[in-house]
């Protein structure tokens, strides 16, 4: 399994603000939970999709860097198309029903200076809206685009999402983190292979 896809690599901690166990997702990660764990991440131009089956109270979050790309490049979870498939398929494996899944989507801020023509944040936001529409998954809440990075907490058991818009002082930090991840992933060796199951 590609290291960027491993859900057991997600950092878990006790969140003092909400007094609950939390799991902090970094770019390329996703996680599905069926308990009171808060899923949290910090977003600049990246997007996080929070999906939930309200009947089973199961939900998950992903964090992707770019809308689409070459899934065979060694780090496919950086791309929204693959990250969305991973999240949806994991939820379905755990018993979620596709027709009940609903979405809340966040991020896509244009925090990278100098990218005024077709910025990454805008492309990510457009992608997630189009993808979910094509999959017939309703978006019941969103906070996309703009210029501010965000920190979000998603509570899959209740469907609640808390969004904290970060001040401009955090823009450089979030943009630097996202740029560093993009640079690291662009140098990732091409890996992969085919496993045949009979």
Swiss-Prot record:
It holds the Pfam family CheD. It catalyses: L-glutaminyl-[protein] + H2O = L-glutamyl-[protein] + NH4(+). Its EC number is 3.5.1.44. GO terms for biological process: chemotaxis. GO terms for molecular function: protein-glutamine glutaminase activity. Keywords: Chemotaxis, Hydrolase. The keyword Transcription does not apply. It is an enzyme of class 3 (hydrolase). SUPFAM superfamilies: CNF1/YfiH-like putative cysteine hydrolases (SSF64438). It comes from the Bacteria. InterPro entries: CheD-like_sf, Chemorcpt_Glu_NH3ase_CheD, Cytotoxic_necrot_fac-like_cat. Probably deamidates glutamine residues to glutamate on methyl-accepting chemotaxis receptors (MCPs), playing an important role in chemotaxis. HAMAP family: CheD. This is Probable chemoreceptor glutamine deamidase CheD.
């Amino acid at each position: 399994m590609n290291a960027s896809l491993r859900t057991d690599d997600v950092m878990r901690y006790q969140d003092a603000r909400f007094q609950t166990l939390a799991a902090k997702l970094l770019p390329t990660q996703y996680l599905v939970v069926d308990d009171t764990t808060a899923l949290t991440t910090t977003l600049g131009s990246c997007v996080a999709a929070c999906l939930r089956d309200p009947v089973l109270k199961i939900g998950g979050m992903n964090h992707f860097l770019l809308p689409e790309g070459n899934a065979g490049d060694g780090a496919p979870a950086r791309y929204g198309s693959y990250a969305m498939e991973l999240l949806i398929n994991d939820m379905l494996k755990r018993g979620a029903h596709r027709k009940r899944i609903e979405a809340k989507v966040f991020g896509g801020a244009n925090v990278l200076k100098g990218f005024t023509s077709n910025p990454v944040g805008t492309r990510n936001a457009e992608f997630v809206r189009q993808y979910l529409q094509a999959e017939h998954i309703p978006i019941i809440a969103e906070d996309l685009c703009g210029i501010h990075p965000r920190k979000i907490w998603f509570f899959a058991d209740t469907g609640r999402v808390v969004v904290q818009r970060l001040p401009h002082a955090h823009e450089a930090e979030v943009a630097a983190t996202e740029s560093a991840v993009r640079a690291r992933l662009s140098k990732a060796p091409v890996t992969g292979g085919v496993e045949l199951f009979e």
